[in-house]
């Protein structure tokens, strides 16, 4: 069979015809449990010796179909679907980290990720080392034999900083650690994480995949590229499971125990979202670039940050890693916090909301919301400015959005 294009793979997969009734859409198996013909069959399923479903906190046919769809279009060795992006992050690091281990990352993180590292993991004896990931020497100074991972957001939110992934991958692998990346800002067809040395990818499927802001979800993609015999915590499993060692630990223990598996209803909705993701993204990203270019001309706007602008300091690296349209999120600075609030309050078309990559364009003031519980000192260390507005660009026309922005800036 000929290799299908990415666009075709979003709509058609080799296992589409597995349903006994030939449904064009994957049925929703809205069940908690499954019946077995014999006690022996039940034992085999619960011990993981067969592929039969035992309980929907562990696996479910609808969720499994969604996972296979993602696996097909990304080439990942395995995909685990959970109920949020934060569930994906916590499941990964409870799988990898142990007391005495450290994680090397940037302070430029989503607020809850930062809090998870700084507070939750610290309580388990895991050290988090913050450094400038755009500076290889600063990273090398932080990694050591106890580093269990280097973690980053491929385009930070809301700072829009970009680090060289191949360089970070080389540093991580040299120290026997995987490179883990949150790639939520750029979808699969724009950025192929494994080609840049990413071993484990995190995606908040709430965003581009869902599209309509109807459901929460998070994905863990394991590309099977890391040698887990180098991992202090997982090396004892490496001989048995090889490239699948991380996934084996995750699926057999952590994900079962934390109970954050995706629900079948969400998997169904997000499977539908996958089918239109490429079409939606093309419009969103093109409009985002137009807005960034036009915002630069407005006198009330002090600065515009979008890595697709040629004037952006990360433009060359961003283009190399993500192409000409690096996501549908931009930020811009106004004169003050008060000016930001006046702008937000005057918006008529653009919605005031916290989500990203909805079909609708959304505006937020990150310093007072996502980072509102942080101290001023913490916000400064994370480069979160009180003068910054973040826009997540939707499917409206650029002209309609510019009209709303212009009237709100008056």
Provide a role label for each language-model segment.
Residues 221, 331-333, 392-394:
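Short hydrophobic/aromatic beta-strand micro-patches
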Residues 50, 267, 274, 325-329, ...:
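Short, solvent-exposed beta-strand edge segments and adjacent coil->beta transition regions
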Residues 258-260, 276, 281-283, 288-360, ...:
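Conserved small-domain helix->loop->beta segment predominantly found in fold-type I
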Residues 10-16, 78-299:
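Conserved PLP-enzyme active-site core in the AAT-like
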Residues 33, 38-90, 112-119:
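Conserved N-terminal alpha-helix of the aminotransferase class I/II PLP-enzyme fold
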Residues 1-29, 220:
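Short conserved active-site loop signatures built around small residues
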Residues 100, 118-119, 127, 145, ...:
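PLP-dependent enzyme catalytic core of the Aspartate aminotransferase-like
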Residues 33, 223-226, 334-338:
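Short loop segments at secondary-structure junctions
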């Amino acid at each position: 069979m000929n290799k299908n294009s990415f666009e075709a793979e979003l709509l058609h997969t080799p296992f589409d015809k597995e349903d006994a009734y030939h449904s064009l859409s994957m049925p929703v198996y809205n069940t908690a449990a499954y019946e077995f013909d014999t006690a022996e069959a039940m034992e085999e399923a619960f011990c993981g010796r067969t592929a039969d479903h035992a309980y929907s906190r562990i696996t479910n046919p609808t969720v499994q179909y969604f996972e296979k769809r993602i696996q097909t279009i990304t080439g990942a060795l395995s995909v685990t679907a959970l109920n949020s992006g934060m569930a994906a992050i916590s499941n990964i690091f409870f799988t990898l980290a142990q007391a005495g281990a450290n994680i090397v990352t940037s302070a430029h993180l989503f607020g809850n990720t930062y809090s998870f590292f700084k507070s939750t993991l610290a309580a388990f004896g895991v050290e988090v080392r913050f450094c400038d990931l755009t500076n290889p020497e600063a990273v090398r100074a932080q990694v050591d034999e106890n580093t269990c991972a280097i973690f980053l957001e491929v385009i930070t939110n809301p700072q829009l900083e970009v680090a060289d992934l191949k360089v970070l991958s080389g540093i991580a692998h040299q120290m026997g650690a995987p490179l883990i990346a949150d790639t939520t800002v750029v979808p699969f067809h724009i950025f192929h994480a494994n080609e840049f040395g990413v071993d484990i990818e995190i995606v908040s499927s709430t965003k581009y995949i869902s599209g309509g802001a109807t459901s929460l979800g998070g994905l863990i993609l394991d590309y099977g590229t890391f040698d887990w015999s180098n991992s202090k915590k997982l090396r004892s499993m490496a001989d048995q499971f090889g490239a699948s060692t991380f996934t084996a630990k995750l699926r057999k223990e952590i994900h079962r125990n934390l109970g954050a598996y995706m629900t079948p209803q969400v998997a169904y909705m997000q499977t539908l979202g996958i089918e239109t993701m490429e079409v939606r993204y093309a419009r969103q990203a093109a409009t985002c670039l137009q807005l960034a270019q036009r915002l630069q001309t407005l006198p009330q706007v002090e600065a515009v940050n979008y890595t697709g602008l040629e004037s952006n300091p990360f433009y060359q690296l961003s283009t190399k890693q993500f192409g000409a349209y690096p996501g549908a999120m931009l930020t811009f600075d106004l004169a003050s916090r008060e000016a930001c609030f006046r702008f937000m309050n005057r918006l008529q078309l653009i919605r005031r909301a916290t989500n990203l990559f909805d079909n609708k364009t959304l505006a937020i003031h990150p310093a007072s919301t996502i980072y509102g519980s942080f101290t001023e000192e913490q916000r400064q260390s994370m480069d979160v400015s009180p003068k910054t507005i973040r826009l997540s660009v939707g499917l409206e026309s650029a002209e309609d959005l510019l009209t709303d922005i212009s009237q709100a800036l008056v």
